[in-house]
Regions:
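Short, surface-exposed helix/turn micro-motifs that flank interaction/cofactor sites
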Residues: 16, 34-36, 52
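Flexible, glycine/small-residue-enriched loop-and-beta-strand segment within the central core
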Residues: 1-27, 54-55, 60-63
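Beta-rich strand-turn-strand
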Residues: 20-34, 39-42
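Short acidic capping loops at alpha-helix termini that bridge into adjacent secondary structure
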Residues: 13, 31-32, 47
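Short amphipathic alpha-helical segments
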Residues: 47, 63-64
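Acidic, glycine-centered active-site loop in nucleotide-sugar glycosyltransferases
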Residues: 45-47, 52-55
């Protein structure tokens, strides 16, 4: 059923992940991010943003 992909997931300081969030191998979530419940994170998230959706997209800047 395909090959295994192993890569670290990095979650920055002060980030929050909602319930049932999925993060794909190798993704970095920047500091101060909020990931909405049920989101699927398939690419890196820039710091201080609100991300939601499938796939997750930046929907709001949270400031510093």
């Amino acid at each position: 059923a395909g090959e295994n992909i192993e890569a670290p997931i990095v979650i920055g300081d002060g980030s929050w992940l909602g319930q049932n969030v999925s993060v794909i191998a190798g993704v970095t979530i920047g500091a101060g991010c909020m990931i909405a419940a049920g989101a699927v994170v398939v690419s890196d998230c820039e710091p201080n943003g609100l991300y939601a959706g499938v796939p997750a997209r930046r929907i709001k800047d949270l400031g510093e």
